[in-house]
């Protein structure tokens, strides 16, 4: 159910950059939180649609056990209603509002499509909106399924009113677990980019190192990538990056600003 672009910064040698003691890492941290929140919507909704199709009586969704389903079987549309009070999910996060999934075919099968919209949706007090697509395209030359993931008109609104705007287009490649019926033995790699805006700055991000998601972590309520790096390109030209580590199921990221690293535990 994470989701980017131009100025030749990637060749910079971080070891030679000065430490920028007055640089603010909060924008990169907010980007990590927002990207994860948008990715959660896609990944959790895909997971929930699969679980419903396989067993309409299923009731232990990642969103939380208090979710109400409104099913339009004619138009293959499912509304996951989390209510005004909200549901606390398996990850300990409270979500409110509605997630509306419009699907064609079984998700994760080549040719299937999944479109997602949100209605009065929030995550632990952060309002989230946007239009999502998560479509299974075809198997590549290695036999791995590739999926096209996009977010348009995304907004991530903090409780204090600050707004991060967001759009992205990324490719997910299903590299392990395709032959299994188990939802929690899958591995996906993702590459691509995003464009975001925060506090008047328009910036982009690109995957510097392929970002890896392992569904074994999802069973423990951890939906963050296990490894990989985003490189962020801001108007000020200062090198920024978000590093998800080397494979552990955790919520730790290292944000780099110029030549200084900041370690954060994300929500």
What do these predicted ranges mean?
Residues 7-11:
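C-terminal motif of bacterial Sec signal peptides marking the signal peptidase cleavage site
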Residues 1-3:
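Sec-dependent signal peptide recognition
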Residues 13-267:
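Low-complexity, intrinsically disordered segments exposed to solvent
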């Amino acid at each position: 159910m994470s989701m980017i672009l131009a100025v030749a910064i990637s060749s910079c040698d971080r070891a030679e950059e000065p430490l920028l003691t007055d640089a603010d890492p909060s924008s990169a941290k907010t980007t990590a939180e927002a990207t994860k929140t948008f990715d959660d919507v896609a990944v959790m909704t895909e997971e929930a649609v699969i679980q419903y199709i396989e067993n309409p009586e299923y009731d232990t969704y990642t969103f939380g056990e208090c979710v109400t389903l409104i099913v339009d079987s004619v138009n293959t549309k499912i509304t996951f209603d989390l209510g005004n009070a909200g549901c606390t999910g398996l990850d300990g996060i409270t979500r409110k509002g509605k997630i509306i999934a419009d699907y064609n075919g079984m998700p994760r099968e080549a040719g299937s499509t999944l479109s997602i919209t949100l209605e009065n949706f929030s995550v632990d007090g952060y309002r989230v909106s946007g239009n999502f697509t998560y479509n299974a395209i075809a198997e590549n030359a290695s036999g791995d399924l590739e999926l096209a993931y996009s977010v348009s008109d995304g907004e991530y609104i903090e409780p204090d009113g600050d707004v991060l705007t967001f759009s992205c287009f990324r490719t997910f490649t299903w590299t392990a677990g395709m032959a299994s019926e188990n939802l929690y033995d899958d591995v996906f790699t993702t590459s691509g980019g995003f464009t975001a805006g925060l506090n008047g700055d328009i910036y982009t991000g690109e995957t510097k190192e392929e970002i890896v998601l392992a569904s074994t972590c999802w069973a423990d309520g951890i939906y963050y990538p296990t490894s990989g790096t985003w490189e962020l390109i801001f108007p000020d030209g200062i090198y920024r990056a978000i590093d998800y580590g080397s494979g552990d199921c955790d919520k730790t990221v290292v944000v780099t600003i110029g030549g200084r690293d900041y370690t954060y535990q994300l929500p």
